[in-house]
Every structure is written in C-alpha cells, then in structure tokens.
Design a protein with these regions (language model features):
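Chalcogenol-based redox active-site neighborhoods
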Residues: 1-131
Length: 131
C-alpha cells in the first residue's frame, strides 16, 4: 500500500481513485492507514464477502485474508485490469499509473519481485503456527 501512497497524486491526476480493501476490523484498518500515512481509505470487509466474490480470498493465512490484488475499474463499473498477486510478486503502482496515463495495453503491465524482509518471514512463521 505504501507504493500506492507514493504514486497517489499521479493516480489522481490520471483521473482515478485509490481504495484499499481489508478483512481487518475498522479500528485496525484505520490504525494501519494512519501508520502508513495513506491518503486513501481502507474499506473493511470483515465478513469476507467482497474478497470471496472477487476471488481474492486466502483462507490459508491468519484465518483468512485478502490476497494482494489490483483492479482498475472504469466509471461504467467495467473491470479494465485485474491482477491477483502473491506476497513476492506484485504490480508496481508506477505500472498502474502508466496504464492510466497512456491507456496502455493492459497485458503490458509487469509485476516486480518483492524480497521479503526478515520480519515478513517471522510473521509468516507465526501464521503457520497459529493454524
């Protein structure tokens, strides 16, 4: 989400909005939004309805979370681009900015490799133990 914070003004300048969706409770989502200084809202899907309907529900993590994903939806509610990612491969926000600014072929958007930090590994191990 921090990547989208860094490109937020470019995304808005291209005429788009940014919204994050989380399965966390509203207070936890708001704390994260404040901690990361996100200029966009985090919508809460505590019953996992939206993430299930959009095919991004990951039941194997923390009792069920959303997979990292990006959707570009036009004003007519048509999904123009969708990427369901993994922890280690994500579409950079700069690629979405390019897509929006140039009306580029959506197939040209590339994912980048994310190298997990040590703290990410610790979190993943805790998730496995909590199962």
């Amino acid at each position: 989400m921090a990547d989208y914070r860094e490109h937020y003004l470019e995304i808005r300048s291209a005429g788009a909005s940014v919204v994050a969706v989380s399965v966390d409770a509203p207070d936890k989502s708001e704390a994260l939004r404040v901690h990361l200084a996100l200029p966009f809202p985090i919508l809460c899907d505590t019953e996992h309805r939206v993430v299930r309907d959009w095919g991004i529900y990951n039941s194997g993590e923390k009792g069920g979370i959303a997979k990292p994903a990006v959707f570009v939806i036009d004003p007519g509610s048509v999904v123009r681009y969708a990427a369901v990612d993994t922890v280690v491969r994500r579409v950079p926000a700069a690629e979405i900015v390019s897509l929006l600014q140039n009306a580029a072929d959506v197939q040209s958007v590339r994912r980048r490799v994310y190298i997990p930090l040590f703290s990410d590994w610790i979190s993943a191990i805790r998730n496995l133990i909590q199962r």
